[in-house]
């Protein structure tokens, strides 16, 4: 029996690094349409775009997507998801996958993977994914979020800083990674149960989440277990900057 889950794609027009990001054209389509098309290839029973901007609603309706208007004052994409789950009337045990609206090349297979991982780990409140890092540039890039997990695959911490900090190795040379240290980049896709989303919103943001601008730290702060698996297919570049946008355009317009 296939797993039933819903994909929600949060899409905000007011990106700090790349304004108007969801509607920027890639190969003749808005970025959010590429994300929606990839999500529709997954096993999700329903794919919904969530936004607080009327122009995004109009654009999404034009290409046939189900789109919901949400409040504009949410602290994070997860808070927005909770409102969507309430609007859709989803039960507490329903699984919702948050697919970022700036991942136009997201592999559908890893959307299925993260939903299945949450279903397989009832001790976890969240499931998410990561991939190995092999170069120091990514480790020191604050736009690449690093994650460290315990022996059971549960997250210990996330950070925009190098994590872990290889004290002795980096004191000598920051241009190469130390042997035997498994650096991993967090892939910003999450699976949740609706009941957890309700708890998440009720807690409100914590100082650690606000300092790093990483919403998953709110969950760790409150003792929630986050299961982290290596993605079975590494996603191509997401779009955080104008340079990322040009790389994705070259890939999709080739």
From Swiss-Prot:
Disulfide bonds: none annotated. It is an enzyme of class 2 (transferase). Keywords: Cytoplasm, Lipopolysaccharide biosynthesis, Nucleotidyltransferase, Transferase. One of its GO terms (biological process) is lipopolysaccharide biosynthetic process. It catalyses: 3-deoxy-alpha-D-manno-oct-2-ulosonate + CTP = CMP-3-deoxy-beta-D-manno-octulosonate + diphosphate. GO terms for cellular component: cytosol. It is found in: Cytoplasm. GO terms for molecular function: 3-deoxy-manno-octulosonate cytidylyltransferase activity. Its EC number is 2.7.7.38. Gene3D superfamilies: Spore Coat Polysaccharide Biosynthesis Protein SpsA, Chain A. It holds the Pfam family CTP_transf_3. Pathway: Nucleotide-sugar biosynthesis; CMP-3-deoxy-D-manno-octulosonate biosynthesis; CMP-3-deoxy-D-manno-octulosonate from 3-deoxy-D-manno-octulosonate and CTP: step 1/1; Bacterial outer membrane biogenesis; lipopolysaccharide biosynthesis. Belongs to the KdsB family. NCBIfam families: kdsB, PRK05450.1-3, PRK05450.1-5, PRK13368.1. Activates KDO (a required 8-carbon sugar) for incorporation into bacterial lipopolysaccharide in Gram-negative bacteria. PANTHER family: 3-DEOXY-MANNO-OCTULOSONATE CYTIDYLYLTRANSFERASE, 3-DEOXY-MANNO-OCTULOSONATE CYTIDYLYLTRANSFERASE, MITOCHONDRIAL. This is 3-deoxy-manno-octulosonate cytidylyltransferase.
